[in-house]
């Protein structure tokens, strides 16, 4: 049976990635009028160029402080050891689409509503990358996808 994922639905999703290196890969590609709640990101270091090479996760999206589009908002950077794992299980949410741009820092209810409305189709995307091209990480990300279209 197919999973219903139309307007008004909420589903749990899980994405798996193997042998990820220093190239930034999207873990979750946002869709306008969706809200994503990340439940966990599990990272395992299979191979490292050097002990202590980092694993990093960041969101590319709208900066509500600087009122700028397409900005990197860092979630975590973790130094890793070969055969070691890191579990990020602090829940956080992000909108699938960027808001209509506003001037300056978000400082009003109107600005806050613009962020929630996601009136621009520019995607906000959660990324992962390692420190070095020789690094290899396996990643599992589990999240809730709320479709408010």
Predicted regions and their residues:
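Solvent-exposed, conformationally flexible loop/turn segments
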Residues: 16-23, 79-89, 97
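Short amphipathic, basic-aromatic surface patches that mediate peripheral association
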Residues: 43-47
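Short, surface-exposed beta-strand/strand-loop-strand elements in extracellular ectodomains
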Residues: 49-67
């Amino acid at each position: 049976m197919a999973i219903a994922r139309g307007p008004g639905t909420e589903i749990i999703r899980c994405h798996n990635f193997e042998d990820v290196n220093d190239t930034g890969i999207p873990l979750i590609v946002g869709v306008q009028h969706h809200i994503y709640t990340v439940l966990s990101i599990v990272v395992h270091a299979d191979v490292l160029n050097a002990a202590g090479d980092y694993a990093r996760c960041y969101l590319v999206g709208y900066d509500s402080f600087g009122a700028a589009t397409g900005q990197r908002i860092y979630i975590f950077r973790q130094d890793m050891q070969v055969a070691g794992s890191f579990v990020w299980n602090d829940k956080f949410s992000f909108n699938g689409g960027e808001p209509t741009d506003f001037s300056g820092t978000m400082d009003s209810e109107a600005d806050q509503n613009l962020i929630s409305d996601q009136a621009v189709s520019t995607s906000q995307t959660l990324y992962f990358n390692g420190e070095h091209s020789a690094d290899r990480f396996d990643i599992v990300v589990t999240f809730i996808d709320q479709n408010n279209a």
